[in-house]
């Protein structure tokens, strides 16, 4: 569900109701809940209805897959639509029980439905359907798999002002669109900003939003989360759209510093700080960031940035946003700093397992009073795009080829049948398996977690497995000391196997293969990920077509993501600006190792044999000596007809100094890649496939058997130095 507050989806908000004309009520009174008898509610007029003739949806059009969250008023489910025009599409279904909603909450729910029906923006969650039964209300919304942006980043990623700028810019566009429709958001806080699978933001949860407010009018409700409230909301002087820009400043401050600008020991003190305290501006922030924050934290709302008729245009012109291309941002053409670790369409990795492990069940609702049903007249809704699709009788998309969802109580063997062994490694065994429900074939890697922790491998596959040339992760089961990692099945076999057995293979085809593999590696390197085991046996074909686009990079068991000392991931911007040179040097070494492995592959594709292993009689010491010398032949055999550009590229990818090798990006820019249509198409000769594969295996076996280089550390970290420190006499008098 695109609501991040999954433990308590609809929390009680301290609300003091007063006469809007005089705005009675003090900040101190805002710290308590009014009693049931004191509640005074105005019902808003219902102005939105579904056009007559539009086809409505009901709960029978959806299959429940998982519970995403649960609160006192209802549940949030992951659902799949089973009827056209959008059959098989996944949604989040928010189900509210009418009988448990107070009149005030019923009004807010209807208001949320009305607002969502009106809003169509790339950075605001979309309402697709709304309908009701006698006892319940249903909102069918975008299913956002990336989770809550701010708490997720605070737990996983180190980010910079440049990264914060991206999210704030998307948020500014979303808020500006709401304001242009006369909507005050009024509940801007970290939990209500979620990520989609690409890493773009979506504003969600409009239960406290106020509709139909123009710049001449004000709202007077005391609502929202107190730490993010603007002063005029706290003191009930009446508020307009400018209150959202104060909250926007609070979010900006929190993202840049990790703390809130105004936070007391309780609600009363927090409100007093908001009204009176001087802002302590951290001096490590850039001048541009400080300037924007000061312009947003104006206690007089008429002086606040964004309060004028221009709205967000004032904010967009700020020097802090000078590097943002607003048109590209709106079109989602700018790359987010962080991509969530999600795999298939129904992945709930970022949702609380307390809920996702439950069996999804929509219990019958108790019928409410007759007046409650009257309040929700006109609640039903079908998104216009869906009505148009249905009118055109658009054919249903193919059924998603993903396994059925499973709870933590279901075992791997309950879902899959295991077949023959595909491969055996030091810490794992790989087998073919068949999904019992769909009869589809997959591969399962069974890992002994007492020998190796596979969490990094699994996270990398979750985050990057949707790349077309990286093996796709389907499922993960954790049972005792065994972890079952289910992936797509590589039916086409190993890359080198196929090339060496191919009747005809040319230099031009070799360039196409390297381009596909290298663009995938470049994508990983740009995100701070190194594979570190790119031997040819880990590059396979997903099918028998032999098409370079069917190539998959597999086995990320030795892969690493660049992390800070505290274990958090680092965005590319953070890496470039704040990472120590020795860390970058190590990262460059690992990237160089990946390029060296691709150089070995390229040499073998062109020559028909490996560069450093000559035969079965070679010892590991001999192979390592040749590798260490950096010498290999580019004469004789196929090399007499291979292009000069190919020889140049091989030499630069196999340079003995890893820091002098080409980067993946530079390989992609080399003329042998960019001008491959001009390369020779004559057949390349090769040795017997078994001899070549044996030599390749011997090369990597020799590398793995070599002793690692000693890691130098400061003298003070040695055991001897530590022992000496303990023996030093005390000088304390």
From Swiss-Prot:
Q: Could you give a GO molecular-function term held by this entry?
A: protein serine kinase activity
Where does the record place the Protein kinase domain? Answer: 62-321, 416-673
So where does ATP get bound?
Answer: 68-76, 94, 422-430, 445
An example GO biological process term is: positive regulation of DNA-templated transcription
Q: Which GO terms describe its cellular component?
A: cytoplasm; nucleoplasm
UniProt-listed InterPro entries:
AGC-kinase_C (IPR000961), Kinase-like_dom_sf (IPR011009), Pkinase_C (IPR017892), Prot_kinase_dom (IPR000719), Protein_kinase_ATP_BS (IPR017441), Ribosomal_S6_kinase_II (IPR016239), RSK_N (IPR041906), Ser/Thr_kinase_AS (IPR008271)
Q: Which Pfam families match?
A: Pkinase, Pkinase_C
Q: Which SUPFAM superfamilies match?
A: Protein kinase-like (PK-like) (SSF56112)
Region entry Disordered, spans: 18-38
What Gene3D superfamilies does the record tag this protein with?
Answer: Phosphorylase Kinase, domain 1, Transferase(Phosphotransferase) domain 1
Keyword Nucleotide-binding found: yes
Catalytic center residues: 187 (proton acceptor), 533 (proton acceptor)
Q: What does this protein do?
A: Serine/threonine kinase that may play a role in mediating the growth-factor and stress induced activation of transcription.
Q: Which protein family is it in?
A: Belongs to the protein kinase superfamily. AGC Ser/Thr protein kinase family. S6 kinase subfamily.
Tell me the protein's name.
Ribosomal protein S6 kinase 2 alpha
Q: Which organism is it from?
A: Xenopus laevis
- Give the gene that encodes this protein: rps6ka
